[in-house]
Amino acid sequence: MTTNIHDQRILILDFGSQYTQLIARRVREIGVYCELWAWDVTEEQIREFNPNGIILSGGPESVHAKDSPRAPQYVFDAGVPVFGICYGMQTMAEQLGGAVLGSDMREFGYAQVEVVEQMALLNNIEDHVSPNGNALLDVWMSHGDKVAAVPDGFITAAKTDSCPFAAIVHPEKQFYGVQFHPEVTHTRQGQRMLSHFVLDICQCEKLWTPDAIIEDAVARMKKQIGDDEVILGLSGGVDSSVVAMLLHRAIGKNLTCVFVDNGLLRLNEGQQVMDMFGDHFGLNIIKIDAEERFLSALAGTDEPEAKRKIIGRVFVEVFDEESKKLKNAKWLAQGTIYPDVIESAGSATGKAHVIKSHHNVGGLPDDMAMGLVEPLRELFKDEVRKIGLELGLPYDMLYRHPFPGPGLGVRVLGEVKKEYCDLLRRADAIFIDELHKHDLYNKVSQAFTVFLPVKSVGVMGDARKYDWVVSLRAVETIDFMTAHWAHLPYEFLGKVSNRIINEIDGISRVVYDISGKPPATIEWE
């Protein structure tokens, strides 16, 4: 009998912090299931979820602003421990009768808090010791307002010179609040604080482990699918690859994978996918060579968003045609992951702005009349990778740098042509090859080459040449929300440039992109 890995759970209410998903990932890393919901959740939904504890995230608002978000009153009446982080602490303090002081001065960055009263959340945690013998903690602050008076029953557990209530606790109700962010790595022992809350205070067991997740997913899919057949669009990316391996374990030959080669993939990628999943793992896999169809549809289009939509539309058409040939397939599998679910759910009162449209199979026709199988919809990307390793997928494939859904369609600037894609594929392969050879690949977060639709004069021997330009792009980032351009050695960049120009007829110049994010995005389109 499989363990109920969802039996013990933490609810995280999102007040808009850029770090909120990080809180959820940290709780999962501890080994406990959690879900992330918008702050305006109803009492009925909380009751139904029945959490062992609740975490209130940070957020950009001031509790003094009109219509600023508040925790549902039931959070404080549910009889479970509550942990307020930054804004979460402020709204808890004000809602329970304390006072929050507005401030035009933000405290942002490293700070040192002094523990003045022991509490379970900070038990046996110290980074330094103060002259009077108290524990000092290295933490990360990001706030404007601050608590000025604690509600009845609360005591002060930690302070800084500028923040007298850096950590507070209601010992009887087990309500905790901190003005810093334990979820970020800059708070040196933040993970221990979260672990104290989840394991010691909420008394959850570590049931959420890769092998248990696999066992649970396989059991649920067997129950859902039975003896039916399933079709999966396999791209060779992390998500669809892990879905393929999970389904193969659950239903074996009743899975058919469809791999659409759109002509916008990396060098030899199509053959690598077929070799790995067809020959090595023994999956049923159909390869569709659709390069000409995609490039014909893209001809004459140079606007990035229009290109994305065309690539998505043509994929749906090709996949739909192939699925209709598989008359026994009653289920469609997708690699939806938890951040996709969070993004789709949103807040009942929130607003969102699309910077770039996401490329996935979400737009499949209504008349496909298939059930949906989404075994990864509870998982974050880092969890998907861990599952993939457990299932036998190679590390190099699972931890490869991100590749956009539209592929080279958004790395060839302007109109996409076969000539441009072929040149770009080879140039990019040289860049990645040299990164591996110089042990730099895993030291940057993402690296790729971009084709620029401009020609430049060059000299090769005694001959003048007039050929295309490519740009190398490499960035360092923790969360891909902000990024620095990677300071790769000049000698290395020179070697990559020489190889590209000497080995590829058609490229005369190589440049290096030194733009950060912001203001630039990581991808050029």
Curated annotation (Swiss-Prot):
Source organism, top-level taxon: Bacteria
> Which PANTHER family does this entry report, sorted A to Z?
GMP SYNTHASE [GLUTAMINE-HYDROLYZING] (PTHR11922:SF2), GMP SYNTHASE-RELATED (PTHR11922)
Question: In which residues is ATP bound?
Answer: 235-241
Domain GMPS ATP-PPase: from-to ranges: 208-400
User: Matching Pfam families, A to Z?
Assistant: GATase, GMP_synt_C, NAD_synthase
Q: In which pathway does it act?
A: Purine metabolism; GMP biosynthesis; GMP from XMP (L-Gln route): step 1/1
Spell out the InterPro entries in the cross-references. Class_I_gatase-like (IPR029062), GATASE (IPR017926), GMP_synth_C (IPR001674), GMP_synth_GATase (IPR004739), GMP_synthase (IPR022955), GMPS_ATP_PPase_dom (IPR025777), NAD/GMP_synthase (IPR022310), Rossmann-like_a/b/a_fold (IPR014729)
**Keyword field contains ATP-binding:** yes
Q: What class of enzyme is it?
A: ligase
Q: Which terms in the GO cellular component ontology are assigned?
A: cytosol
Q: What is this protein called?
A: GMP synthase [glutamine-hydrolyzing]
The cross-references to CDD domains, in alphabetical order and at most eight, read:
GATase1_GMP_Synthase, GMP_synthase_C
NCBIfam families this protein is in? guaA_Cterm, guaA_Nterm, PRK00074.1
Positions of transmembrane segments: none
Could you list this entry's UniProt keywords, alphabetically sorted.
ATP-binding, Glutamine amidotransferase, GMP biosynthesis, Ligase, Nucleotide-binding, Purine biosynthesis
Query: Which reaction is recorded as catalysed by this protein?
Result: XMP + L-glutamine + ATP + H2O = GMP + L-glutamate + AMP + diphosphate + 2 H(+)
Q: Name one GO molecular function term.
A: ATP binding
The entry's function note states:
Catalyzes the synthesis of GMP from XMP.
